[in-house]
Amino acid sequence: MMHPSNSASHITDDNGQTSADSRSQETVVREKGQAGGIFLHAGWRSAGTWVWSRFRALQTVTAFYEPLHPILADLRAADIPALEPTWTSGHPKLTAPYFTEYRPFIRDDLHGVVGYRKSFSADRFGPVADAGFSTLQAYLKSLHDQTRKQGKIPVFKFCRSLGRLPWLKDAFPEVMHAVVLRNPASQFASGWLLHQQWSNPFFVAAPFRILGLNQNEPIVKEVIEVCGVRLPPAPVTSIDEYAAACEQFVRTVDGDNAYRAFLAVWMLSALRSADEADLLVDVDRLGQSPEYASALRARVRGQVAITPDFSAARDLVAQMKGNASLMKEIDGRSIKSIHASALGFMVSKRGVSGPGTDGAELIKEKLVLARELSEQWRYY
């Protein structure tokens, strides 16, 4: 387990060079009005892992991968070396296994990361923090504070946090809350192809699980109705049992319903992002525009004093267009109308109705792009 140490007395740049300074890095950051870290909120298959890897490459950063992942409940230090990307994941080659940064927080005599609870893995979309949030806050604060004491900048890459983004922003106002945004057609297709080609149901089941566990929230119920989602005919008992029921359900789910469920979760997440994000990372544009990649780098440097390199981003839109013929068991013509319904709903809600706001315009662009890309999909 990590032991507290004295604050760093040297300032280290992104290249690992240090210079003596009587003040701690924490003090310098406060005086410059910069954020004390980054919470990188992303959905599954959004290219969030690639964005996170750009921060992990910096020597001044400690980059935590998915701090709400259920694997952390039972993780042992001996398990970490085997947790490398598979070639089917589409993740970038990593310089170290996924969960390496948690090693100091695992006690030798116990399984699991100190402070983690498996209940953290279920995202929530309630208007106010639930009863268990204070425990989650304490867990993340421990990771954050211990990292700062080591003289590093913490970057957390989440895949289960977008519903709780308002709660996390209230609890951690000192960090920059960045949201990775990808058009829903490409994001869905990435998970659908893994389901079709490799019998991996997780990414298709996840939206049904999130919607089912949150279906009593008024905003969730409304989005389910707008999208016409048919949830699994299973009672919501425990989180694990409902997750298993969802994975069984999607083994025979029709593509139309799977996309509707995914789009519903995307819409809910986008609403949170438009209202709460300090920075929106447009990964569709990132691979198309070197100017945008450079501007994003400068924006991060200005707020957090680190300079990630985004120049190697792939053109994910072109990639999706090239893979359109691989999409089977879903017809783009049958889901064409849902994008119009989604856009109308999003425009009607607070945070997306203001004229010309960056978040609102970007969300609209993503829905228009999704309609264009999905029109090429055919059932057979």
Per-region residue spans from a language model:
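Short His-Asn-centered micro-motif
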Residues: H41-G43, V155-C159, V180-R182, D282-R285
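Walker A (P-loop) phosphate-binding motif
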Residues: G33-S46, F55
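Extended, charge-rich helix/loop segments that form flexible
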Residues: H111, G115-D123, V204-D256
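Conserved phosphate-donor/acceptor-positioning beta-strand/loop module used by diverse small-molecule
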Residues: K157-F158, A171-W192
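A conserved segment at the C-terminal end of the G1
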Residues: G48-V61
